[in-house]
Amino acid sequence: MAAHTFYVNFVDDSFSKDDWDKFLGRSVNEQVTAGVAVHPLRDVLDDLESMDGLVKQGIDVVVGGPPCQGFSLAGRRNPADVRNKLPWEYLEFVQRTRPKIVVIENVVGMSHRFSPDEESPFVQLQQALRDTGDGYIVQGVAVNALHYGAPQNRPRLMILGLRVDVAEANGFVATENLWRSAFLDEIDGEVPALAPRPTVTRAQSPTVADAIGDLQTVFPAHDGPRATAFRRQLQTRAAWGLPRPSSNSGDIPNQTLRKHSVLTQERFRLYQWLRTSDISPRVLNRALTDEQAHDDLARDLAGSGFPAVSPDGTKIADDAAELVKLIDRLHTRKHSQKALAWDEPAKTVVTLPDDYVHPSEPRILTVREMARFQGFPDDFVFVGKETTGSLRRRFEVPQYSQVGNAVSPFLASAVGTMIRHLLGDVAADAS
């Protein structure tokens, strides 16, 4: 599904489902030649014709996000788990194609040590890249998409490598310490050559309202200067250097509202009221097993404004006692669900849509709203199922997962700008 989305947006958007099914049946080399290899990376590495073509073509940059939490120089923690092989296959691809620049992106958990006898996978993978092929100088960075213009708090780790001969010929060096991003007006010291420079100040950082305020119907559309500037960036994918759509219906794609039961909508409205009242949503996790527990909670809520009314005007409760009864009826063991705030950036976009409730409408977020938080243009189309069951997610990548697994285009653009400057300097020195 994710490969189909890539093909539709980067190669040919007239490709039908039948065309895609036929494409999946093509050989490895045919897919590589077409620009999208859907086969496993191991198949590409084992296909000599494909690899010879890539080597002869010459590759400047290799970018990827192999699952690295289980990476170890001493061996694989679980040899039966194919995901533990992917970092090594990625490094093999780098070794054989000799790109000038390598970029690896992953979650912050990659920095955790799993054994007192080993460094973290993040540290070990940096060393492995240094030793790959002709060698690379390596810069580790901790970045947050928020510092690059995304309306979302999204911390990530990245490893950026520049081939040693290219680095030495042009005087580029990496710092020994991990570099951490910050807002443009809060950067402490110089930004390393192998680090993406932040692009927004704290005041310029967009909020949930800036990102999706025009996609809701409860309040007037939020159209301040910051919102206007943000949405202008996302109007078309052509503004990002991507191919223009062959057709445009005028409708924003992937903006299908999810349907919920009456009980679920009640819970969502309660989450919204709790947020606006500055009350933790964890009150829904409290076990109200006796009258004393009810009285204690009612006393805690007594200072809140009543009647309790949700953002869409629905009355939730007339007083604290009625609200406690509602909380008892809507009790849940789910700890991660909460309503987003209009005046803050979004939480980290994840692959499952159920954790975050819309700020003013009793529903979860749409695929498009999540894509806005990431920074995808409005005419960037996600194809396939919207969501799927947990077991099928092992081999299917539905739309919500495609969005949640992606690198924010805002951060990706900053990395691309850094690479363009590096390679531009290399080309200038070579001429």
Residue spans for each PLM region:
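Glycine-rich phosphate-binding loop and adjoining beta1-alpha1-beta2 segment
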Residues: 1-54
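Conserved beta-strand scaffold positions in the cores of enzyme catalytic domains, especially
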Residues: 35-38, 138-140, 348
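Class I S-adenosyl-L-methionine
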Residues: 47-56, 74-321
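Residue-level detector of short, conserved catalytic/binding motifs and their immediate flanks
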Residues: 60, 157, 347
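N-terminal Rossmann-like NAD(P) cofactor-binding module of classical short-chain dehydrogenase/reductase
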Residues: 60-63, 103
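Glycine-rich, N-terminal phosphate-binding loop of Rossmann-like dinucleotide-binding domains
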Residues: 66
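Active-site beta-alpha loop architecture of Rossmann-like, nucleotide-cofactor-dependent enzymes
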Residues: 69
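C-terminal target-recognition/interaction regions appended to catalytic cores
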Residues: 230-431
